[in-house]
Each structure stands twice: as structure tokens, then as C-alpha cells.
Amino acid sequence: MSKKKGFTVLELILAIVFVGIFVVLFFMQKVNADAMDRDEKRKVAINAMFYALEEGYYANNQYYPEKIENAEVLPWIDPNLFTDPYGVPLWNAEGGSNYVYESKNCEDGKCKSYELRSTMEKEEDYVKTSRN
């Protein structure tokens, strides 16, 4: 009796199952890593806005702005940082941005404090509050 060369059906099925499991695990890790990367970008942006508000805006004016309506309010940072990872700017009138600037204790457009917040995917919201 001659022996045939090749793979059995069982060997082929097992190989396909192993490859399928590997592909699923790879994509699960990739999705998780992408979300963590977006969260890091959000933290960088919030920190940049925070330091621009504290070291730039407040140092020059002795108060905080009531709104951040455009990048010109905080010219000390890269204007691209005002746009969240999904492309929605902080001042979007329709909302939907991952970034929120909430001024507090305001009088005539001059505010005594604020809160910066970013909605995160893999952890709690990232929040920075004014120093003063």
C-alpha cells in the first residue's frame, strides 16, 4: 500500500482554527491599543490647554476666559490640539467634542476658575481644574 503525501482534512481544519484565533486576538489587541493611544492624545491636549490657561492666559490677564471660542484665545499651543481624536473641535457649537471647557465664577466675561474635561475610552474622565 502506498502512502499519499499531503494534509488530512482534520489537520487543515485545525490550522484554519488556529489562524482564526490568532487573527481575532490580534485585532482585539489592536483595537485596545488604538483606544489607549487616543486616550493619551486626549491627555496631552488637556494638559497643553491647562498650562496655556495657567502660564499664558491667567499670567497675562489675572482671570480666565469665559469661553474658548477659537485657537486665538490660547495662542501658546498648537491649534490642532483643540481638536479631539475624532476631528471635533473644543468650540463645536453642536457639541460632541471629547473636550469640555467649563468656566466658573464669571463676571463680565472674566472668570475665577474653570474645569477642563476629556471623555476617555479606557479609563475615567481626565479632569484638570484651575490652580487659582
Q: Where are the regions that the model predicts?
A:
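Extracellular/periplasmic head regions of type IV pilus-like filament subunits
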Residues: 54-122
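Conserved hydrophobic/amphipathic alpha-helical signal-anchor segments
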Residues: 24, 28-74
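Low-complexity, S/T/G/P-rich flexible repeat/linker segments used as non-globular hinges
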Residues: 123-132
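N-terminal single-pass transmembrane signal-anchor helix
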Residues: 2-30
